[in-house]
Amino acid sequence: MAAGADADGRPRAPAQAAVDASFDASRRFGGVERAYGAAGAARIAAAHAVVVGVGGVGSWAAEALARCGIGRLTLVDLDHVAESNVNRQVHALGSTLGASKVQVMAARIADISPATLVDRIDDFVTVDNVASIVPASAGVVIDAIDAPRAKAALIALCVARRLPVVVCGAAGGRLDPLALRRSDVADATGDALLASVRARLRRDHAFPRQRGAPFGVEAVWSPAPAGGARAASPGEAGMPLACAGYGSVVMVTAAMGFAAAADALAALLRPPRGSASPAPPRASSRGTPPPARAASSAAGP
């Protein structure tokens, strides 16, 4: 196997180097240990999470995982930081314009959590490459992309691998972060992106066609945008969230990313089936109780 390649021969940027001796994880992440317990914090520090799409939602999810002391992160995105990203993406600054999103996010994470190993994949997920993009060592995936076909393929792969996945719905046009919901992707309403993904999962990946039948896949989503939300131009109103699509605000994109990160950690820390140990605490979404089954085996829209 060539240097800098994974088991599939796919090139990956190397994880960062050894940690500086002055780094004190117990001091830096003591609050995480008090919240999740010593055993939970140790499991987080040993876990491998994948964030697919490092933009308005994914960048905040990666930030949250790093600030919880995650052991390894794989960041997947081919995009570069643009000025239009500054309103909603944590890595978008005047000093980072034009730089690779995964590169600047990796540098930020190194400053937050030096012990976190970061693998950078400069690529977009497609139907053809998804199997080689998601590493076999992953413990959970956060899907923060907005292309329905690729999103469905990623979800289907995770389900086939019994890999927990948390799916993020559309954030464009939403203004209220407290309107976020958590449910099975089959139960999400008012989200055109997830509706399109559901249709593809049923048509292309043999997901249940019966109305109301759960997919066993968790989604974080928000109802349809307010009537005043506008796309950049007529004819673009169906776009979920892009520079030329609906307007967006960081209060919603960050909240969705944080919720996805919380659910990803809950999936990582959930006891194996048959265990009597209680799951770590987790906040419920406003107006919607947590579903009976969440991202324990896979997730997607």
What are these regions (language model features)?
Residues 1-50, 83, 286:
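N-terminal charged helix/coil linker that caps or initiates catalytic domains
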Residues 2-23, 136-140, 145-150, 165, ...:
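Glycine-rich phosphate/adenylate-binding loop
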Residues 51-53, 76:
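Conserved N-terminal Rossmann-fold NAD(P)-binding element of oxidoreductases
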Residues 57:
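Hydrophobic/small residue at the entry helix of a nucleotide-binding pocket
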Residues 67-72:
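Conserved S-adenosyl-L-methionine
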Residues 75-113:
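Glycine-rich phosphate-binding loop and adjoining beta1-alpha1-beta2 segment
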Residues 121-129:
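Conserved SAM/SAH-binding loop
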Residues 128-138:
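Short amphipathic alpha-helix with an adjacent loop that forms part of the alpha/beta core around
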